[in-house]
Structure formats: C-alpha cells, structure tokens
C-alpha cells in the first residue's frame, strides 16, 4: 500500500460511491467496524450511516478534496485534508467546507475505510494552507 493507492480508493471508490449514491459499493468499502464522527460530534456505525444515506435522502452533487496529506503505516493509512462538498437533503442544497481525517486499513489485500471524521469550517476560512 502506498499514498497513490490510498488516494485512488478515496477518490474513485469512496467519493465515487457517495456521488453516485451506490450504497452497495459503500457497504463493501466500509469496514465492519466503520465509524463516522460528524462535525456536530455525533457518531454513527456502518449500518447507521448506510441507513441515513438510504432513508435520509442525502445525495451528494459534488465533493472536492482540496488539500491532501496521506500517511501510510504498514497496513493502515490516514488521509488528512480539506474538502468542499455540496449535497441535497430534503430538497435543500447545502455547501460545506471541512477538514477531514479518513483512516483506511488493509484487509485481505483490499483497502477498507475504518473511520471518517469531519470538522466544518466557517465559510470565510481559506481552504489553502
């Protein structure tokens, strides 16, 4: 596993599945012990995240990783960065800018997303560092 492998999975599999609404692909990507920590501090497990996407009507229309820093530690990798996302929920469009940490683990020669945490940034904070 190297940084390029991790970013490919992050962009193509994770962001790709979110943008296309492919819950089966997300389910396959998320590890069984996956945890999402939202900007408000709430924490969801794999099934809760998939249920929220399915029943909550959340649809992403764009996701852009603006700054990325990948760290690889044997069979674990972290993506640290800043991102912009636009999504629709309940007929309302929201655009957010946030910092993120995504932790991937290598399981049976495949990268699986084990943890994702985001911290929303005020709209007037520059994404560039």
Regions found by a protein language model. Name each.
Residues 1-25, 35-129:
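A beta-strand edge to alpha-helix "cap/lid" segment located at domain peripheries
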């Amino acid at each position: 596993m190297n940084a390029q492998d991790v970013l490919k999975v992050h962009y193509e599999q994770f962001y790709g599945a979110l943008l296309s609404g492919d819950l089966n692909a997300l389910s396959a990507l998320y590890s069984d012990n996956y945890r999402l920590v939202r900007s408000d501090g709430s924490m969801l497990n794999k099934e809760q995240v998939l249920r929220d996407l399915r029943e909550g009507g959340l649809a992403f229309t764009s996701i852009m990783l603006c700054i990325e820093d990948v760290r690889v530690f044997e069979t674990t990798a972290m993506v640290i960065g800043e991102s912009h996302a636009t999504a629709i929920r309940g007929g309302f469009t929201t655009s957010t800018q946030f910092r993120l940490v995504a932790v991937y683990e290598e399981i049976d020669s495949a990268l699986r997303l084990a943890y994702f945490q985001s911290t929303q940034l005020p709209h007037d904070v520059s994404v560039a560092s």
